[in-house]
C-alpha cells in the first residue's frame, strides 16, 4: 500500500512540474543573476562590466555576442556561468550587449559592427580597464565579427582572440553546407539572378527576419537536438535541476531578436552561399578584408556534435591567418552546448582558461 501511495505521489509531483513548465515557466528561469555595471552605451549597444573579485591579469576578457540572441547564454545558471567562471579566474570581464533590433534597423550590416560598433566599444573598454590590449571572444556569428574586426582594423588592440563555432569553410558544414553549395551553383546558372542577389540590390525589407522567425529557424536547423531536449524533460520531470535548466534554456531560445536585413545579406548571401572565407578574404561593400592580417594569439574551437557549424567548417581558420600561435580544439556539445553544457564547463572551460592565462599579463 505504501508503495502505491509513493508511486501516486511521484506521478502527482511530475504532473505539477510539467504544469509549471508549461504555464509558469518564467518562475523557473535561472539566467543572468550575476551582478554587473553598464560602463558605456553606444547607439543601441551597452557594455556590461563584470568586475573580478580577485583580479590577477591586466588584459580584460571581452565577449562579443552574436546577433539575435539575448545575453543569457553567457550567464546561464548561477552554478555554471561563463562570465562568473572568468571573473573568479582572475579576469575582469566585459560583455558587448547588442540592442533589441527591429524592422527600423534593417539596413545594419557587417560593416556597421566591425567598423563602427565594435571599435567604439573596444575603445571604451580600454579606457575603463586602463589596459592597452584586450582578449576578445566571439561565438557563432560573433566569431565572424571578431575575426573580421581583427583583420580589418589596424591596430586592433587584441592580444588574444578566441573564435568558437564560426563558419570559415561554410560548404564543409555537413548537410547545411552542401545545401548552400548546391543553391549557389543553381544561382550561378542565371547571371541576372546572381547579379540581383549578390550585388546587394535585394530590398532589406525582404530579407529582414523577426525574432520569432529566428527562434523557429534555430529549432528547424537542429530538430534532433530540440527533440532530445523535450524527451529528456519528459523522462526527468521529477528532477528539479533538469526542470529549471530546461526552462532556462527554453527561455533563451524563445526570446530571440530580429536579424537586420543587411546582416542576412552578408551572412547568408555572402558567408554561407559564396563561401569566400575559405580563401581567407571577403568583400564587404567596397572593402576587401584579408584574414592574413590577423597576427595575435588564436584559439579556435568547434563543437564535436555541432549540427549547424561543423568542425570541418571551423578548422580551416588555422591556416588562414599570420598568427604564430594557433590552437585548435574540439569542444563537447553542439552549437549551444559548446557554450553552455556541463561537459563543456568540465572539459573546455579549464582548457580555455589555462590558454588565456598563459597569454595574459600577470599583475
Where are these regions (language model features)?
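Short beta-strand/loop motif that positions the catalytic acidic residue
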Residues: 294, 300-302, 306
